[in-house]
């Protein structure tokens, strides 16, 4: 991508959407032996190589925050939309939310013992990773439906937060909250410093990503849009209202058509 020069013909939404694609454009990490003068000139976005991708980010922010620029964007209109999987957090070898659901299966089966000898729950309980890798999409849908529904929204949020505090990736031996891309954290910080409001639009589960994003990126729930299930309204014995997560799909945010309002 070439550096973006000021031009009255530049589409502001296009400028913002370049941020979604930047990680794929070049290598992100600076060499450990980078000269001192390069580090000094690269105080902004220090984990990025000097090059077209980094310059594009700097140019987007420059031309949209300079009041004398024809591409100036007022404070209330400054938004930056990011994908999540493979952009902000790692997606290989397995999505973090899928790992969470697989690890939730024993607790679900404890409450619903009739699932113990039913596939795909039987395979997950076996701990056989080779067999789990072969599970079909339909199998995963059954697991997600069983592990992500049937509890109140508050209970789900508490469970997800608790898991994120203790779970470790088996390969890296690090919390999943640390398996994010440092260069992109720098982009988020740089945009906030220039009055941009970051949003996440993802095909991942909206409720889980909202918990993760608030903890790791500081992005509040209302700025995260993802695949969402329905909820059922009810009252507790003490008369307090609550929402229970339902298996009904409310928004499938995995297709371009479902995201057209954000482009």
What residue ranges belong to the model's regions?
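Non-catalytic pre-domain segments flanking phosphatase-related domains
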Residues: 2-4, 9-10, 14-84, 106, ...
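A generic structural micro-environment signature
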Residues: 7, 94-95, 102, 111, ...
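Secondary-structure junction/capping motif
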Residues: 11, 96, 254-257
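C-terminal cap/substrate-recognition subdomain and adjoining C-terminal extension
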Residues: 35-48, 52-58, 62, 77, ...
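N-terminal low-complexity, Ser/Thr- and acidic-residue-enriched intrinsically disordered segments
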Residues: 84, 92-95
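A metal-dependent, Asp-based hydrolase signature
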Residues: 94, 99-178, 182
């Amino acid at each position: 991508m070439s550096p973006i020069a000021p031009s009255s013909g530049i589409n502001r939404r296009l400028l913002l959407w370049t941020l979604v694609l930047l990680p794929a454009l070049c290598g992100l990490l600076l060499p450990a032996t980078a000269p001192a003068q390069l580090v000094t000139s690269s105080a902004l976005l220090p984990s990025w190589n000097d090059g077209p991708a980094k310059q594009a980010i700097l140019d987007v922010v420059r031309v949209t925050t300079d009041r004398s620029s024809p591409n100036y964007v007022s404070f209330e209109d400054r938004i930056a939309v990011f994908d999540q999987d493979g952009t902000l957090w790692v997606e290989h070898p397995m999505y973090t939310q899928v790992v969470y659901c697989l690890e939730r299966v024993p607790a679900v089966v404890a409450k619903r013992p009739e699932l113990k000898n039913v596939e795909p729950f039987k395979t997950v309980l076996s701990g056989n990773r080779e067999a789990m890798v072969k599970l079909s999409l339909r199998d995963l849908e059954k697991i997600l439906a069983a592990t992500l529904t049937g509890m109140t929204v508050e209970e789900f949020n508490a469970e997800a937060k608790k898991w994120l505090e203790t779970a470790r990736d088996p390969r890296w031996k690090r919390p999943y909250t640390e398996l994010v891309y440092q260069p992109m954290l720098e982009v988020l910080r740089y945009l906030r410093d220039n009055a941009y409001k970051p949003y996440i639009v993802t095909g991942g589960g909206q409720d889980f990503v909202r918990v993760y994003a608030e903890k790791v990126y500081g992005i509040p729930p209302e700025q995260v849009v993802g695949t969402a299930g329905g909820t059922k309204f009810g009252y507790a014995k003490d008369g307090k209202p609550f929402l229970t997560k339902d298996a009904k799909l409310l928004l499938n945010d995995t297709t371009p058509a479902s995201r057209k309002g954000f482009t």
